[in-house]
Amino acid sequence: MDRRIAKLALEYAQKNIGVVEEGENAGEAVEAYLASCVPSLPAGNPWCVAHVRYRLKQAATALGLTYDKSMPRTGYTPDYVSWAVKNGHWVSSKKVAADKDLVRPGDLCCFYFSVMGRHAHMGIFEKWIDETHFYTIEGNTSPPQDIVGVERDGDGLYRKKRTLANLGENGGFIKLDF
């Protein structure tokens, strides 16, 4: 994927921070995100990945570039992680702990939930704040002041302050510069 797509997708996400649901996993913006998936997902479905997919597709179109045809188009985080591992685009949080330069603005962050036994939430990496904290833009999450932890079924699109530990034991990043 052309790096410009990842960077513009991040810019679009930043401009839409604060978009909230109208109902549960519904509303005009949320339904547009869900419709961007293949197959299209109806209102009521989790939309964190759908938001990422929507922004990448939107950015590719705006730049007149092709969205990588091998990349998943679903709304399911494990599909993206499997694809990234298979194609050499996966970077574990353990590797990133040793080298912060492995992840760049616009890359995708994938959260692993041990209680579910899978990756179950995705956002867009924004930037490092310091040695241990970074910002993400995440859909279908709780507001930043909610410090309960990682919320994968919240009400909006927010900037979140995270640590690598927040990604879970098998969490990591999908590099989008290929």
Language model regions located:
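Solvent-exposed, flexible loop/coil residues
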Residues: 34-38, 84-87, 154
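Active-site signature of cysteine proteases
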Residues: 128-178
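N-terminal capping segments
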Residues: 1-69
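Residue-level marker of intrinsically disordered, low-complexity segments enriched
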Residues: 3, 15-18, 28, 36, ...
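...with weaker cross-activation on analogous glycine-rich loops/strands in unrelated enzymes
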Residues: 10, 62-144
